[in-house]
Amino acid sequence: MTEHSRDTPQFYLTAPSPCPYLPGKEERKVFTHLVGERAGALNDVLTQGGFRRSQSIAYRPACEGCRACISVRICVDDFVPSRSFRRTLKENEDLIGALRPPSPTSEQYGLFRSYVTSRHGSGGMADMSVLDYAMMVEDTHVQTRLVEYRRRGPDSRINGRGTGDLFAVALTDILGDGLSMVYSFYNPNIPERSLGTFLILDHIAKAKEMGMPYVYLGYWVNGSRKMDYKRRFLPQERLSPHGWERVDE
């Protein structure tokens, strides 16, 4: 292997497979491996170009005749929570999200199983074993953290950690210009808390505290109901063939 081939990422194209978002469509992906000392820098550049990370792979859609998957990132500095978002923040003000190393636990996996069974019982994640979950968390060569959400305790202001049961978890990459929410899951039995929305709102707050301009949400899929929630977080930027374009309403 030459010096050039080691330093230059190699990209590959998957075979067509059924689209998980739009019935009757097929998807293809272009992907590369995120390994070695330059994995973090490469992940930054690729995320800014519309890629997503899954374990040690960065990928983006490359579907023939379809451009429904659009990369979305929230503009942190200009974000103002709506009335419904403020209600969600109020409902969850007793929770705190603690950043931890990407180390899986049986408690996390139990919550993950409850979430997947409730929300994605027939999806590809339904069959994930505890070892599969551990790989999803640990197989990273970039700056990744787990954000664990628990109730605030008497020492939370000092140590930044909560106490008691685990309510939610977010697998998050720390990029040069923001936070990328790789995957999140939460207790599905307390819908009144709107925990999925709260996790995004809390990541916006965390990014602002860290001086980062963006929270990357992955793909908004035009025509997919389960991805439609991403449109609610405004202002945001969406990646087009002409670059990132701001959307305010």
From Swiss-Prot:
Pfam families: ATE_C, ATE_N. It catalyses: N-terminal L-glutamyl-[protein] + L-leucyl-tRNA(Leu) = N-terminal L-leucyl-L-glutamyl-[protein] + tRNA(Leu) + H(+); N-terminal L-aspartyl-[protein] + L-leucyl-tRNA(Leu) = N-terminal L-leucyl-L-aspartyl-[protein] + tRNA(Leu) + H(+). It comes from the Bacteria. It comes from Azorhizobium caulinodans (strain ATCC 43989 / DSM 5975 / JCM 20966 / LMG 6465 / NBRC 14845 / NCIMB 13405 / ORS 571). GO terms for molecular function: arginyl-tRNA--protein transferase activity; leucyl-tRNA--protein transferase activity. Its main location: cytoplasm. Keywords: Acyltransferase, Cytoplasm, Transferase. This is Aspartate/glutamate leucyltransferase. It is found in: Cytoplasm. One of its GO terms (cellular component) is cytoplasm. HAMAP family: Bpt. The keyword RNA-binding does not apply. Functions in the N-end rule pathway of protein degradation where it conjugates Leu from its aminoacyl-tRNA to the N-termini of proteins containing an N-terminal aspartate or glutamate. Belongs to the R-transferase family. Bpt subfamily. GO terms for biological process: ubiquitin-dependent protein catabolic process via the N-end rule pathway. Its EC number is 2.3.2.29. Transmembrane segments: none annotated.
